[in-house]
């Protein structure tokens, strides 16, 4: 079934596995009951665990509940054009045991993006995901597209972006998904993307700043800045600046900035506690790829927090997220040492669907409506480093970012 397959729940939990001759069914109002075909009887309690259950939430996107001439509930999957008597929400049942409340959080590090969106319909919502042709960006884009959103993959490499669009359409031919050119290493490209997006005259409900570069040899962009800093921070900063009027008109809207736990292992201030530009865009002699990446991820959280402080009064919230440790993706492809490291770590990492979960959680769950200025890991709020919480550093970084953009674009126009 599509719902179970998308959620990664093809296999049944051994504890909930039914004995031979039993079948799991649901009532119209969502209660689970069990049919014993051998003895031709039904009961509310699971035959092995004795638990009562009910299904959680609405039907997955594209599904509809109907009743046949005998009064039996059945389900229509309009996306894959199939009919079944098995409720797709059975993958997401909850125990009916009000006397024993649990403190276990609803989602965690093993949750997938599709599980978070289960039962949600995003028809009419517009989502932009940068760096969406592979990895967690692709899984983020795909998850929203398969739930009805109009998704735009904002990518530098249009050939790979078009392939990503095709892969999504192969899963559902009616998905509303497209690719647009965005090179974060070139401020003019960011400008052109924003102009092209605005020309579509569509709202923007979710902007996911996902694209990043990692472990690059030292290089300067055409704008004269160190590449990791511009791609991971400044390009996204400029993109949000250019689209903030659309976000505000589309409120409630959300910005999600993909950061990393590696932000904890660096600082961007000098010994006097002042923002040090030479640490953000270092010379070749002072450059270390890992440190550059860590600093850019610290910038991501500072930017997200300051963005939330500025735009939340206008209905736009922003949160930063850590997707997961050492996930195998194309982000590491610049040096063979990192490729080897990621390969060795692969058995202990999250899947890409799990890596996209925290991003999708912050972008979609109703309980975060109107809330921002936070940092999330494994679908749970956690505190970032003290440096990342500094409002003074965030304001200074914001002002510096504005100045860098004005100087670069001003010199180019001249």
Swiss-Prot record:
Enzyme class: oxidoreductase
Record annotation: effect of changing residue 61 to R: No effect on interaction with TP73
Effect ascribed to mutating residue 291 to P: Found in a esophageal cancer sample; somatic mutation
Record PTM Phosphothreonine, positions in chain: 12
Entry's Gene Ontology cellular component terms: cytoplasm; cytosol; Golgi apparatus; lysosome; mitochondrion; nucleus; RNA polymerase II transcription regulator complex
Region (Interaction with MAPT), start-end ranges: 125-414
Sequence segments annotated as region (Disordered): 1-23
Region span, Mediates targeting to the mitochondria: 209-273
Entry text on domains: The WW 1 domain mediates interaction with TP53, and probably TP73, TFAP2C, LITAF and WBP1.
Quaternary structure annotation from Swiss-Prot or TrEMBL: Interacts with TP53, p73/TP73 and MAPK8. Interacts with MAPT/TAU, RUNX2 and HYAL2. Forms a ternary complex with TP53 and MDM2. Interacts with ERBB4, LITAF and WBP1. Interacts with DVL1, DVL2 and DVL3. May interact with FAM189B and SCOTIN. Interacts with TNK2. Interacts with TMEM207. Interacts (via WW domain) with VOPP1.
Disease listed for this protein: Defects in WWOX may be involved in several cancer types. The gene spans the second most common chromosomal fragile site (FRA16D) which is frequently altered in cancers. Alteration of the expression and expression of some isoforms is associated with cancers. However, it is still unclear if alteration of WWOX is directly implicated in cancerogenesis or if it corresponds to a secondary effect.
Protein name as annotated: WW domain-containing oxidoreductase
Gene designation: WWOX
